């Protein structure tokens, strides 16, 4: 699995929650770019954001501004929805992390289903545009092997199960 270790990132900062606050306030405060700049000044060597299909937090203008103004690589998390992938190919972030998306989820609750129809085509399309591809996957040897076969540049492991284990072990379930 050495092939996944090509780039070393020390601090990647997800700035989505800046947009969550902005949308809750229904004004342009806090400003997404000011948050991005603060993260970079603080040492971030990657900025991550998630363009959801429903645009509930981050929107297309945010992504354009982030890509155009960031001096560090931008990782854009997204679904494999065709409209979203068209946008990603047009604005070409450094990396696209493909994630599952269900509108009813508050946050992503699991990894991408690697047998999803069209996934390999999306990966190839992004790579042909010069965009590095990452997959957000559940932690299993099988998923890691499949990701390797798909020749993605890196993977991100969903660790929700591990994060929630204490509550599961100490609940009355």
List PLM regions with ranges:
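Glycine-rich tight-turn/loop motif centered on a GG-T
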Residues: 23-29, 71, 104-118, 160-173
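Histidine/lysine/aspartate-rich catalytic loop segments that bind and position anionic ligands
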Residues: 134-173
